[in-house]
Amino acid sequence: MTIGLVVSDVDGTLVDKKKQLTPGVIAAVERLRAVGLGFTIISARPRSGVMPLAETLAIDAPMGAFNGGIVFKRDGTVLCHHLIDRVVVEGVFALTEGAAVDTWVFADDKWYASNPDGAHVASERVASNQAPIVRQDFSDLYDRADKITFVSDDAALLAGLADRAKGFADRATIMQSQTYYLDVTALAANKGDGIAALSDAIGVPLDRTAAIGDQFNDVPMFARAGVSYAMGQGPEAVRAKATHVVAGNDADGVAEAIDAILAVR
């Protein structure tokens, strides 16, 4: 099997802990392109958070934001767009009412947040490349939400909310993109369907794709790609689902994966 397209997650994978692209990763992507192989990214981030990376890496291929909820190109062209079903939005807000979580809603290319001083707001400002619009009432966004994120450092609390939300599993994708984020997106906005959409848009068969990621929301694309690479710092259960394990994101694990792909072509 010859790999024709590499699809990388962003946070915890492509960028380091400072949310930055390292020289080693940038050079590895250039090596990949130099031999005619494709490279693109798929992320839980909104488009605003993906675009700076696309500019730095000069990605002209379609990319995925919101785990594939939006497939788009650097020139602004949108190839597909999946919003969360309003019934799901109403339902998850009802089941989290009173829970000790911060709430973020991404809609209309904007980020709305309930708490401007939350523990992970500063990090999200960098990741999303925008400032939050603070509000407590999100009801006017129910028909056009791309992603809802419930934020807490209480792992047991988020796990409990995820369990309670299983009733929406046939109408939405509900997964943790980080240990402290519980994300709700459209049913088709998952990285399994996302990598399939990217593969189709770019014209490379799924069995000739390589997926690189670090978290549970990356596992669906591991299952559909021809080969998969898990980052070394990711959870053990995620690493177990990948074909290979590479170094962590602070040790240029993506570059290691790319070089392994180049070595066998």
Where are these regions (language model features)?
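Phosphate- and divalent-cation-binding pockets in alpha/beta enzyme and binding domains
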Residues: 24, 49-52, 160, 194, ...
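Residue-level signal for inorganic ion chemistry
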Residues: 32, 43, 67, 148, ...
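Conserved acidic, metal-coordinating active-site core of Asp-based
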Residues: 98-212, 216-224, 233
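Asp-based, Mg2+/Mn2+-dependent phosphohydrolase catalytic module
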Residues: 224, 228-265
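Active-site phosphate-binding/coordination module
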Residues: 18-120
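Short, structured coil segments at secondary-structure junctions
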Residues: 57-59, 66-67, 168-170, 224-225, ...
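Asp-based phosphoryl-transfer active-site loop
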Residues: 2-17
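Short active-site oxyanion
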Residues: 36-40, 60-61, 147, 207-209, ...
